[in-house]
Structures are given as structure tokens and as C-alpha cells.
Amino acid sequence: MKKLKLICVCVLAVLTALTAAGCHKKDEIAVKTGNIKFTSAYYMCALINADKEAKSKVTEELDDDESTEDIDYYSKKIDGKKFVKWVEDTALENVKKIAAYKTLCKKADLELDEETESNVDSYVEYYWTNYGYSQYYEPNGVSKETYAKYMKDAYYSNLYFEHLYGEGGEKEISAEDVKAATFENFVLADKLEADFSSKTDEEKASLKEQFNSYVTALNSGEKTFEEVYKEYNGTTDTEETEETDSEELKPVNKYASVLGTEDTGYASDYFDDASEMAVGEVKLIELDDDAGLVLLVKRDLAADEYYVKNLDLSSRHLLKDDEYEDFIEDYVKKMDFEIINYAIRRFKVKNIAEPSATA
């Protein structure tokens, strides 16, 4: 009789578990506001991204003598919050912000253009296939289609930002202020690098001699940077030929790199060095700990319309990101959200599966 009771209890437990699991539909809604709905898989995508962001923050805050391996993330705090709580709050907050972006864009009759959507699709396809994103998201219930939707929706933020602060926008920033921010936070330089890792002392000496010869040739006018670049990289004109629209704006210095301050998307360790150089000046930097060499040739950013134009939006963000973020946060507070806890609480931060190192 006792055995029969035990069997009945076990069967009941299994049936209960199966029933509970079966109650979660594939496209169940987790967050709603107006006509905008987000599925539980969409929320899970936000949770995974928040978890990655949190772990990155923890790693950045480690002391120099602390190991980056086997970190007990869940024992850490971020901005005064326990790790799990921070991840959960950030994920939900990001979903709400996306709802705000989409709502505001709809009111302003704004939609993503075909080029943006196509670029996102290409990005997703590339990283899903080549960078193991499929092994990260799929085991956690996020399909490629859901990830692509999340990425596209995130672009509504930039779309509305441009609507407000872009040229002709409701809160347009003056061209003078934009250019001032551009020239304050970015410089343009031709850059050639040599990595000394795994190099013998003899190879290092040879590279130093080679780079010093480039400095001499550049300063004397014997060689252009293009010639130096091709010689060092072993490239030819044929290999670099590309078909481009003849009317398309092209850079004056096609080999140049944008070097930015730490607050930009172009943050560079060599920004300060390049900033102090005169246009046309050549400088050879020997990296600390004999890590390598960097050859810089300062270029005139102000004279290169291609780069000035491409840095326009980045400069506007530098000037107005804080204001925009405050505006969105206030807007979110005024929105009515329905949070379906049943659909959200099924996901646990500590249960997020990460791809194995051997995958």
C-alpha cells in the first residue's frame, strides 16, 4: 500500500510539472502597453543581454590582483543592487524603453528604412553563424527571428534621437556646436601597427628598423603613407580595387583611422598622442612592456568632409545623450504597462545557459 501511494505521488508530481511546462505557450506575452506586445522570448533576449552587461561591469571593477576566471558573479553588487536584481531590473527597463522608442516613433510617423533593416539582418546572420550567438541564445529559448526583432527595435532609439536632435529636428543642435564636439573628441590619423607578441628579439629588432625607415621615408617625402601601408601589408592596387558610386562621398585619406576619446565609440589609446601632433606630423610610438609599435601620421579632420559627415551623429550623441536618456526615462514613467509576471518569472538569471568553451 505504501509503495502504491509513493507511485501515485511520483506520477502526480510528474504530471504537475508537465502541465506547468505546457502552460507556457510559444508566443506568450510578457509585457504589454497599448498595441505594443513583447513575448516572453523577447524578454529573455533582454535578460541575456542584461546578464552579459552585468558580467562585463563586474569584470571591469575587479582589482588588478583579482582573477577574471571563476568569478562568483552572483555574490557581487552593481550600483548598490544585488547582481540578479540588477539584471532583472535592467532587462525589464530596457524592454520598456524600447516600447517608448516605438511609441514615440509611431506618433511621429517614423519607421526604419529598408537599408537599416537589411543591415540588421546581415549583422544578425553573421554573428549568429560565425560568432556563436546561436549557441548562446537558442538554448535559452531565443530564436534568430526573435533576436533580429530585438535588434531592429533597438534602432528606434536612434531614429527618434535623430528626429529630435538631427539636422532640421525639433531640438536641432547648431552646426557650430556639432563641429566643435567633433573636433574636440575625434582626430584623424593614418596608423600602422606591429604586434610583438610571439616575436623573437631578432624579429622585434627587424620590425623596429623597418618602422624607423618608414618614419624617415615619410618625413623626407620619399614615400607616401599609402606606399608604406601597401609595402608593410603586402597589398597591391588590384587587391584593393572596389566598385563604388562615382557620386558617393569618399574620404580624402582612405587609409586613415578615427581616434576618439574614451566616451566615444572610437575610443583609442592613441587619441592623446595624435591630438598633440601637428597635421602631417609623423610619430613612432613604442608600446609599454615591449608590446609593439604604432606609427601615426596626423591628418586634417576638418578638411575631410567624409569623416566630418560620418561623425556628425556621434557628435550629436555626445552633446545630447544624457538629456535624451532623461527624457526617455520620464516618458516611460508616464506609460501604462501590463507586466505578466507568470511569463517573466519562468526565467531565472542563474539558469541562463552559456555556451561551453569547447562549443
Predicted regions and their residues:
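Short acidic, Pro/Gly- and aromatic-enriched capping/linker segments at domain boundaries
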Residues: 23-29, 274, 279
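N-terminal targeting/tethering segments
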Residues: 25-142
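Sec-exported extracytoplasmic/periplasmic mature domains
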Residues: 48-55, 92-111, 125-133, 152-169, ...
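Soluble non-cytosolic domains of exported or imported proteins
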Residues: 82-86, 90-99, 111-118, 146-155, ...
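PPIase-associated folding chaperone regions across multiple families
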Residues: 136-206, 213, 265-359
